[in-house]
Amino acid sequence: MTAITNIAAREILDSRGNPTVEVDVLLEDGSFGRAAVPSGASTGAHEAVELRDGDKGRYNGKGVLKAVDAVQTEILDAIGGMDAEDQVAVDEAMITLDGTPNKARLGANAILGVSLAVAKAAAETAGLPLYRYVGGVQGRVLPVPMMNIVNGGAHADNPIDFQEFMVMPVGATSLSDAVRMGAEIFHTLKSALKKAGHNTNVGDEGGFAPNLPSAEAALDFVMESINAAGFKPGSDVVLALDCAATEFFKDGAYHYEGEGQTRSIEQQVEYLAKLTEAYPILSIEDGMSEDDWEGWKLLTDRIGNRVQLVGDDLFVTNVERLARGIETGTGNSILVKVNQIGSLTETLAAVDMAQRAGYTAVMSHRSGETEDSTIADLAVATNCGQIKTGSLARSDRLAKYNQLIRIEEGLGAQALYAGRSAIRQLAGR
């Protein structure tokens, strides 16, 4: 009944107009699953490999026909007839078939598309929503959104070096209430930027991308907008940053090209510490570069007791790198991106390892997204309590928020909004 009978794949476009892989899986009983794979702009060097065609005469070399072909030939031959309900076996079969440590032969985009589509088909067979199929009856925590309302770095064409400035509505009463709060802050910020003579164009993830001179200038606008929208910073809403520091770490120092400054490792740590003292910043992602383990440790020792320090490029949803972080006390949270590792099984393993070690986990989108809302279900399934899925603009971002609203409605009285408990450094305050 749940045997995989057919797999189809195609090349579709993501939110940046670049090709990505979409996969359909059909089971013996007629159940069907479809998944589309996201793509990042600022990618960690240790991520699983996204297979691109390299044909400059087609999509500027970014086509994914090789990955599509891999799905419909080798992967179908390998897992056709397997039980879709045995997710681990299906994923392990594809990983073994690939035969490389980073999925470079078949492509993480090929393997992940199949992995997620198989899970969706199995959920349909079981008559369950995906979050319930993956998470069981315990999957009922609605995550606090990290809403990216100002974009910089690789996600925008402006002088701001940090990549994301986010608001987290920890004081909301529910997920739908959190979405309302975020939307009101977003529109208030738009008015404030326009009044000050700044453009209100948006970046890849739907946040505004004004020409501001520094992180402090961006944070000041965000704080002003929170207050003007009628919320209390630090209580109703806290701030989060994604520095994406790997993008501006060169020759052992952090080069802020937009600001025209260079900071040593020690100066970078102190700069971030001062920002957290001046603003209600409760979460910093990639404050140090992906291989600056020394800097990461210094930052953790300096502010880790009061700020969530999220490893994205540092951990790349990889249990081996996460294990090193846990062993050395580096960071205290992991950003979870399904396409960084390339299968559902490995994604869930990373979340489980983090939670067992007392680290938090943040389910995340990529800057190149589609209408696929799988990560919304996975955030609830894993009870991770936090999700990062962009701003309150662009339908590729709103697809995830809208799915969370539907999940909350479906859970009814069982639904539990994570709120202040999502960030351990905040829960005790």
Curated annotation (Swiss-Prot):
Binds a second Mg(2+) ion via substrate during catalysis. The active site is at residues 205, 337. It is an enzyme of class 4 (lyase). Its cofactor is Mg(2+). The keyword Metal-binding applies. Its EC number is 4.2.1.11. One of its GO terms (biological process) is glycolytic process. This is Enolase. The gene is eno.
